[in-house]
């Protein structure tokens, strides 16, 4: 290779390296997408998707109604905190579901709606979103990653009274944590529940809490003096490895009365 040819080779190589470096720098300038911004990204869908970060924002600012599109029995067993459900009986025609949503928004079909169900392969949110669009709704989106991803990202999940009673009286597969003080627990408590005072959790974390150590998917149901106290426990457990945590947003007295009822 002559000195002239060698010089041309070195120059071309340097130019190629510079071009590659500029592409790399341009790529790195864009912020990397995190799992919170992720969507499934399916093509040719009639409604757009939103991410977990979008759902968090919607719940924080109230800019849309978060609608759980699953059956009522699934909703009461655990749903994204702040979500609503207007599902009619399973045998009802599609028009009845659409009418229920229209009632929920007070007839305003431009109202922003975000629908979700049981994750990527669940069809409920897709089906209802398409029915709503066909009925004239103009601002319908889907959180297609759904409840499984919400739990994975430690999002708070509420369980309704009906769901708590079913788990406590019939299913009996859950661990129950009572967030009231030790004195309140000693005075009155529900059989089989564990006392994990919310005020101590704030100060000391979950040290000493009887969390399952062999199965991190064990269902854990939290309650307290009221929903705010139960939420303290939920937020603390959301920072742990436990994957199946729900909290009751009502009061202890409400729960105690219902548990004692035949």
Regions found by a protein language model. Give the residues of each.
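Extracytoplasmic
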Residues: 58, 66
């Amino acid at each position: 290779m002559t000195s002239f040819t060698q010089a041309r080779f070195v120059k071309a190589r340097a130019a190629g390296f510079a071009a590659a470096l500029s592409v790399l720098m341009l790529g790195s300038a864009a912020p990397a997408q995190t799992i919170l911004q992720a969507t499934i990204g399916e093509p040719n869908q009639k409604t757009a998707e939103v991410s977990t970060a979008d759902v968090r924002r919607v719940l924080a600012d109230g800019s849309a109604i978060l609608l759980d599109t699953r059956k009522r029995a699934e909703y009461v067993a655990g749903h994204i905190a702040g979500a609503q459900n207007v599902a009619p009986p399973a045998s009802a025609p599609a028009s009845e579901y659409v009418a229920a949503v229209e009632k929920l928004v007070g007839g305003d079909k431009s109202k922003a709606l975000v629908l979700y169900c049981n994750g990527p392969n669940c069809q409920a949110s897709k089906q209802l979103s398409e029915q709503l669009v066909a009925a004239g709704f103009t601002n319908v989106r889907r959180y297609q990653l759904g409840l499984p991803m919400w739990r994975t990202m430690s999002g708070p999940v509420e369980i309704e009274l009906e769901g708590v009673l079913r788990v406590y009286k019939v299913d009996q597969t859950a661990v129950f944590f009572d967030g009231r003080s030790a004195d309140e627990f000693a005075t009155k408590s529900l059989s089989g529940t564990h006392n994990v005072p919310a005020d101590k959790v704030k100060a000391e974390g979950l040290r000493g809490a009887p969390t399952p150590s062999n199965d991190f998917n064990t269902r854990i149901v939290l309650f307290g003096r009221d929903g705010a106290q139960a939420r303290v426990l939920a937020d603390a457990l959301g920072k742990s490895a436990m994957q199946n945590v729900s909290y009751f947003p009502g009061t202890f007295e409400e729960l105690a009365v219902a548990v004692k009822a035949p």
